[in-house]
Amino acid sequence: MVRYSASPALETKCAKARGAYLRTHFKNSREVAFTINGMSLKKAFIFLDNVKEHKQAVPFRRFNGGVGRTAQGKEFGVTQARWPVKSVKFFYDLLKNAEANAEAKGLDMDKLIIKHVQVNAAPKQRRRTYRAHGRVTAYLSSPSHIEIIVAEEEEAVPKANDTVSRVSLKQGAKARNLAARKAITAA
């Protein structure tokens, strides 16, 4: 059994999926994860499909140096956004896996929400490129470890109406005096 970095409140009401050493850029994956965290599963699938078709963009908030601006970032309140299709494909596959795990557990598909997404940087894979004058330069890739936990949305418990109102000493004295005056004038 693999250890996840977060533990859900109810293990029976959640499903998990994870991928290790995935050949997709860590920085792009982090931005996709931050965007889909908290979405419902259906909404996340629609969003990821739209990113693949360049209808919606993933906002780049942390790793945004040199990232171009696009009007599609306005819905998230940013100007810098991109369409990291390869990272989106990995997230789509992991969400499909989590959905299948939830279905196997008998969870309600319409109530599933992405409760936890985490992306960690995997060890860099090394290659080399040959340069002029006999030099060699490192050619590194930045793979990712991704873990996702989806859970059924908890139903909101209605707040009790039986609230005891706290009255200060001064407010209580005023109320008693007012009641006494009403009693005197009524008599």
UniProtKB/Swiss-Prot annotation:
GO MF assignments: structural constituent of ribosome
GO cellular component terms listed in the entry, alphabetical order: cytosol; cytosolic large ribosomal subunit; preribosome
Compartment(s) where it occurs, according to its Swiss-Prot or TrEMBL record: Cytoplasm
One annotated GO biological process: cytoplasmic translation
SUPFAM superfamilies listed in its UniProt record: Ribosomal protein L22 (SSF54843)
Main localization category: cytoplasm
Entry keyword annotation includes Ribonucleoprotein: yes
Pfam families, per the entry: Ribosomal_L22 (PF00237)
Keyword Lipid metabolism: no
Cross-referenced CDD domains: Ribosomal_L22
Superkingdom, natural source: Eukaryota
Keywords, comma-separated and alphabetical: Cytoplasm, Ribonucleoprotein, Ribosomal protein
Described function: Component of the ribosome, a large ribonucleoprotein complex responsible for the synthesis of proteins in the cell. The small ribosomal subunit (SSU) binds messenger RNAs (mRNAs) and translates the encoded message by selecting cognate aminoacyl-transfer RNA (tRNA) molecules. The large subunit (LSU) contains the ribosomal catalytic site termed the peptidyl transferase center (PTC), which catalyzes the formation of peptide bonds, thereby polymerizing the amino acids delivered by tRNAs into a polypeptide chain.
Extra facts: There are 2 genes for uL22 in S.pombe.
Family: Belongs to the universal ribosomal protein uL22 family.
Binding partners and assembly: Component of the large ribosomal subunit (LSU). Mature yeast ribosomes consist of a small (40S) and a large (60S) subunit. The 40S small subunit contains 1 molecule of ribosomal RNA (18S rRNA) and at least 33 different proteins. The large 60S subunit contains 3 rRNA molecules (25S, 5.8S and 5S rRNA) and at least 46 different proteins. uL22 is associated with the polypeptide exit tunnel.
Name assigned to this protein: Large ribosomal subunit protein uL22A
Naturally occurring in which organism (per UniProt): Schizosaccharomyces pombe (strain 972 / ATCC 24843) (Fission yeast)
Primary gene name: rpl1701
